[in-house]
Amino acid sequence: MAPRVGCFLLAVLISASCKVVTSSDPMCTEKEANKTYNCENLGLREIPDTLPNTTEFLEFGFNFLPAIQNITFSRLINLIFLDLTRCQINWVHEDTFQNHHQLNTIVLTGNPLIFMAETSLTGPKLLKHLFLTQTGISSLEFIPVHNLENLESLHLGSNCISSINLPENFPTRNLKVLDFQNNAIHYISSKDINALEQATNLSLNFNGNDIKGIEPGAFNSKIFQSLKFGGSLNLSVILKGLQNSTIQSLWLGTFEDTDDQDLTSATFEGLCDMAVESINLQKHHFDGFSPSTFRCFTGLQELDLTAAHLKGLPSGIEGMNSLKKLVLNANSFDQLCQINAASFPSLTDLYVKGNRKKLDLGARCLEKLENLQKLDLSHSDIEASDCCNLQLKNLPHLQYLNLSYNEPLGLEDQAFKECPWLELLDLAFTHLRVKASQSPFQNLHLLRVLNLSHCLLDTSNRHLLEGLLDLRHLNVQGNHFQDGSISKTNLFQTVSSLEILILSSCDLLSIDQQAFHGLGKMSHLDLSHNSLTGDSMDALSPLKGIYLNLAANNIRIIPFHLLPTLSQQSTINLSHNPLDCTCSNIHFITWYKENLHKLEGSEETVCANPPPLRGVKLSDVKLSCGMTGMGIFFLVVFVFLLIILLIFSVKFLLRWKYQHI
């Protein structure tokens, strides 16, 4: 009985008082101290006084500024980037930016502009990017040309522009991007294009304009970085109009809501009279698909046929020896051999991602592509009981292989023997059935990145990763370990070169203290979304200077002796843990406040206990863990009772001895 009473009294003695320190958040969100701020959608009618004069990047969209003038932003003379999207601006007055010499980007997207003064853009010495998208402009004469000599990109999409005839003396010498997408442009004249002749390597965007005619010779001898005519109904008109031009990238794809014509061999005749490196024909339909369709494609280096409703490429295609990149995503091949890869012997990049049918890898379908370096077969319902040497035969230079999001794959010993130069292998969300006791990856000595997330791995196989001598990045997210624990002897012991290890969502309950020994090169460890407690941090003691993510675990209390382990890390995330904000955790809370510069996710690092502090940020909590006045009173009473008890005990003992003499 006496011990119980003593414990009760001691519990009362060591009582704690809790205090929450709150701070009012600034109206604008600070992204980088004294430089970058977001003031979007706050109903502001002026620049708030809380914004420092040193602000350089300001996102001020979705507020209310019907007119802007030279006093609107006069205080913020260091502005470099200004976003005024959808601020209901109607008027841009004279010299609005006259004191903003460093300003290089102005975003006026979504403002119903009525008037822009001729000198409204004067002031910035290096204005490079101007966004006038969705501003109701119907003529390019509306744009003030003064002080646009250094302009590199002009965005005029989603307006009512019907002619691209630029104003006289419009400076184009430094122009790199001119965006006219989703306007009402139907005809392009030689005069329109000649006005752009000073611009070199220009990117022109006409997506969403139904171009019905191009004046013959308009693009003659012109050189472009890229041209986009997406959504045009008649590609023959486009290609004939581009004769004798040189284009690095030509985008001729269409969209879901566009009712375009089927493409035939005749459609591409104009392509024979121009020099193009890359063409995109996504979502088109082909009529009479045959080798002759590709007659004018011989100079291409890149071809994108995404979602082109293809069931196969015709055999016998000739002259495409220059093609380096082929994109066949979202088509309907039954077998990989149906792409007739032998027609493209110089391919280095091949994408057959998101095939709409179950794709059979076949055997030796790609063996003629001995120069292939990058292969993406993800999201294609691929299933193979014995992968992958026969399927990837004669691909000795392959460096990147993506087989993620497929059906179960059976991996034999040295499953990637045909691809010894692999540097990145992605098998995420593909159930792997490792048949051999040895590693299926053991010949991949150059592999640097391996994604095995959600692969239903047998993590008890300590040999699984053997042979990966240069592995830097390993993702095993979503796999499970026996009894929810990483033991002393585990599959990571054979990959001492690891720098990044992802172990999130693995249902981990504990980690052995020796689990990460030998991983001295580690710089990033993600243990988030598990069920680890504070005691599991003993396993982290060998790791120093790492990014450590412990978010969304079951950490309540972090013992005092583990704080040095946390202190030796560079960045730590402890958000979304049920942290105890009582005196039993006082050492950690004190450490936390002293190391805020190391902590990530502090807004979501909150108390779970006691109930009065639930949801309060850890950095806002103050604990007084000394004795209160009530505690002192009980201490005096306890000591007094203890003395009386001691006196009576001594007196009783002496009387007992006296009676037994």
What are these regions (language model features)?
Residues 2-661:
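Extracellular leucine-rich repeat
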